[in-house]
UniProtKB/Swiss-Prot annotation:
Cystines in this chain: none
Name recorded for this polypeptide: RNA-directed RNA polymerase catalytic subunit
Chain location of the short sequence motif Nuclear localization signal per the record: 187-195, 203-216
Region named Promoter-binding site: 249-256
Stretches with biased composition (Polar residues): 55-64
Compartments (UniProt record): Host nucleus; Host cytoplasm
Subunit details: Influenza RNA polymerase is composed of three subunits: PB1, PB2 and PA. Interacts (via N-terminus) with PA (via C-terminus). Interacts (via C-terminus) with PB2 (via N-terminus); this interaction is essential for transcription initiation.
Length: 757
């Protein structure tokens, strides 16, 4: 069913069609090769914006550091990072004055969180810089490695599982003269294969102990690893993003908890809410400005863009903000919160993989690791790279670059939003003390500014004052990229406002289609995406019906499950035709078994198995939903699963869908090639960890990782739980006497083995 796209626009007002001009169809661009160049760009740019600051040397690591705080006031429109401490503190004081008690209350909320958070909070998140292996790892593995190293170095505060205790260990680790770590390495040997008698390379993974002195350890603890940000649409150049190690993460988490708590209480903050809630919040601010600008006042809105938000922010400024926000709070609390900005003032950026050189004539390739950039002869590089390396050389230590100013992407989104809102807050008439006044919205580096004044000159004066006030705290509004309109039309965080928010449907386009998890999940996710867009994004009934038909078509092509009575030949059609012919009630077959599609826009909320259950042949039901079916490795079945869908911008978001487990809910097996690499040792650790956690969850189904309290180990807890459960089951007649005896015997054996160990 091919559709002529112009038909979709016959009755669409022009402003609703803006979304079709977005670069959101097709595959997003990915980066290939090394991110070293992008990282050097970031480091060099950040230093350039703060170049008039003071240089100092870190006494512990020897890293040169640039401090632009309270530097010269800007004389031109170039972006700069010279924030003035007294201005930031004053903005904080005024924010508190307009919102009495806001800081106090947020501190109390955060204190509670600090005392309750468990260390497993740090296992969330994807890739994390693992300082023990000097590369990225899944968060859970990186945390396990860190705790293991701490333990072998006599740091044991984290045994109790509170995050705050783990952070105590981090602080102590920085005072140690040396740390002993375990690293993985590969050995290659040539051996003769007995079967084929050929020589083969055998790889073995070894673990070796290595001592790291205080300076090297500090450098690693303060290192942010960098990667290239992938899948960014609408940009010509790629850019670098950072991933911090486990030492920094916990501290950042607490600072962001505090800032989030403040943002929730600020009407101008676009974080931490999202979706419809965010739209409602924004619409309120706009309504307020428009009602107040009756006939006498003009009201204009700037769709704002800031130049290099992260690179002009400064951790020292954040330290000043935290010091102000937590005044009158207990000393321990102030200390915990001030560590993150202090660590960021001393951060090091890891330059990534380095450069790859190829010689076309000699068919040679060689990797120049980042560590060599400090000493290598520059004649091998092209001019632009040569300039970058020359500029960054004074900052290099062991393949990392000292980067004191700037924030790196996405680390303190909430706290930087608080700073932005504090400037918006100064637009009230009682602060401007003149005829113009402003308000607006702030979400991380994105902002919309609404200025009201009696005439155009007043609007201009208001914008100028806002611009200059921002400069004082290191925020640089871009005059080239911001534009101004009569209030009622603007864009903020990709929401388009035109007398109300227009659905920007194109942003959802990438999440339509077949996800590729398995037949069962894909069907469920596909219809849920359509349902959600009907609810949230003005997807009309006709378009939704069309989207559904296109989805079913796409799904059948993906899984080669065309209807049993079709003429299309695929490698599955022989089996599916046979099934079709044997089935009495053909309407009961799932689409993935060659059945018809029974979905329409009225029943998208019902999982397909439930929709067709009454129509199924009995033996088909038996095969489809049989947990003993040998062809299915079953996940634990939960009623709701989470899928990761890719909206067009922003992070992948998690979306819930109904999960009915059938023989179609298979789990693909892990690719074998990883087993021959140096990752193998890590993979085995990870599987071990996974198995233990799964086993533990079997015993404590409601645990969700709240470890048993007290001093018992996980094994002891599981044994005692097994005994209690067995006794209850035996007494209620659920298990026989023999089974009960066997369980008791097994428990005793386990305890005996532990004692011998």
């Amino acid at each position: 069913m091919d559709v002529n796209p112009t038909l979709l626009f016959l009755k669409v007002p022009a402003q609703n069609a803006i979304s079709t001009t977005f670069p959101y169809t097709g595959d997003p661009p990915y980066s290939h090769g090394t991110g070293t160049g992008y990282t050097m760009d970031t480091v060099n740019r950040t230093h350039q914006y703060s170049e008039k600051g003071k240089w100092t040397t870190n006494t512990e690591t020897g890293a040169p550091q640039l401090n632009p705080i309270d530097g010269p006031l800007p004389e031109d429109n170039e972006p700069s990072g010279y924030a003035q401490t007294d201005c930031v503190l004053e903005a904080m004081a005024f924010l508190e004055e307009s919102h009495p008690g806001i800081f106090e209350n947020s501190c109390l909320e955060t204190m509670e969180v600090v005392q309750q958070t468990r260390v497993d909070r740090l296992t969330q998140g994807r890739q994390t810089y693992d300082w023990t292996l000097n590369r990225n790892q899944p968060a859970a593995t990186a945390l396990a490695n860190t705790i293991e190293v701490f333990r072998s170095n006599g740091l044991t505060a984290n045994e109790s599982g509170r995050l705050i205790d783990f952070l105590k260990d981090v602080m102590e680790s920085m005072d140690k003269e040396e740390m002993e770590i375990t690293t993985h390495f590969q050995r290659k040997r040539r051996v003769r294969d007995n079967m084929t008698k050929k020589m083969v390379t055998q790889r073995t993974i070894g673990k070796k102990k290595q001592r790291v002195n205080k300076r090297s350890y500090l450098i690693r603890a303060l290192t942010l690893n960098t990667m290239t940000k992938d899948a960014e649409r609408g940009k010509l150049k790629r850019r670098a993003i950072a991933t911090p190690g486990m030492q920094i993460r916990g501290f950042v988490y607490f600072v962001e908890t505090l800032a989030r708590s403040i943002c929730e209480k600020l009407e101008q903050s676009g974080l931490p809410v999202g979706g419809n809630e965010k739209k409602a919040k924004l619409a309120n601010v706009v309504r307020k400005m428009m009602t107040n600008s009756q006939d006498t006042e003009l009201s204009f809105t700037i769709t704002g863009d800031n130049t290099k938000w992260n690179e002009n922010q400064n951790p020292r400024m954040f330290l000043a903000m935290i010091t102000y926000i937590t005044k009158n709070q207990p000393e321990w609390f102030r200390n915990v919160l001030s560590i993150a900005p202090i660590m960021f003032s001393n951060k090091m950026a890891r330059l990534g993989k380095g450069y790859m050189f190829e010689s076309k004539s000699m068919k040679l390739r060689t990797q120049i690791p980042a560590e060599m950039l400090a000493s290598i002869d520059l004649k091998y590089f092209n001019e632009s790279t040569r300039k970058k390396i020359e500029k960054i050389r004074p900052l290099l230590i062991d393949g990392t670059a000292s980067l004191s100013p700037g924030m790196m992407m996405g680390m303190f989104n909430m706290l930087s939003t608080v700073l932005g809102v504090s400037i918006l807050n100064l637009g009230q008439k009682r602060y401007t003390k003149t005829t113009y006044w402003w308000d607006g919205l702030q979400s991380s580096d994105d902002f919309a500014l609404i200025v009201n004044a009696p005439n155009h000159e007043g609007i201009q004066a208001g914008v100028d004052r806002f611009y200059r006030t921002c400069k004082l705290v290191g925020i640089n509004m871009s005059k080239k990229k911001s534009y101004i309109n009569r209030t009622g039309t603007f864009e903020f965080t990709s929401f388009f406002y035109r007398y109300g928010f227009v659905a920007n449907f194109s942003m959802e386009l990438p999440s339509f289609g077949v996800s590729g998890i398995n037949e069962s999940a894909d069907m469920s996710i596909g219809v849920t995406v359509i349902k959600n867009n009907m609810i949230n994004n003005d997807l009309g009934p006709a378009t939704a019906q069309m989207a559904l038909q296109l989805f079913i078509k796409d799904y059948r092509y993906t899984y080669r499950c065309h209807r049993g009575d079709t003429q299309i030949q695929t490698r599955r059609s022989f089996e599916l035709k046979k099934l079709w012919e044997q089935t009495r009630s053909k309407a009961g077959l799932l689409v993935s078994d060659g059945g018809p599609n029974l979905y329409n826009i009225r029943n998208l909320h019902i999982p397909e198995v439930c929709l067709k259950w009454e129509l199924m042949d009995e033996d088909y039901q038996g095969r489809l939903c049989n947990p003993l079916n040998p062809f299915v490795s079953h996940k634990e079945i939960e009623s709701v699963n989470n899928a990761v869908v890719m909206p067009a911008h922003g992070p992948a978001k998690s979306m819930e869908y109904d999960a009915v487990a059938t023989t179609h809910s298979w789990i693909p097996k892990r690719n074998r090639s990883i087993l021959n690499t140096s990752q193998r040792g890590i993979l085995e650790d990870e599987q071990m960890y996974q198995k233990c956690c799964n086993l533990f969850e079997k015993f404590f189904p409601s645990s969700s990782y709240r470890r048993p309290v007290g001093i018992s180990s996980m094994v002891e807890a599981m044994v005692s739980r097994a005994r209690i459960d067995a006794r209850i089951d035996f007494e209620s007649g659920r298990i026989k006497k023999e089974e009960f005896a066997e369980i008791m015997k097994t428990c005793s054996t386990i305890e005996e083995l532990r004692r011998q160990k």
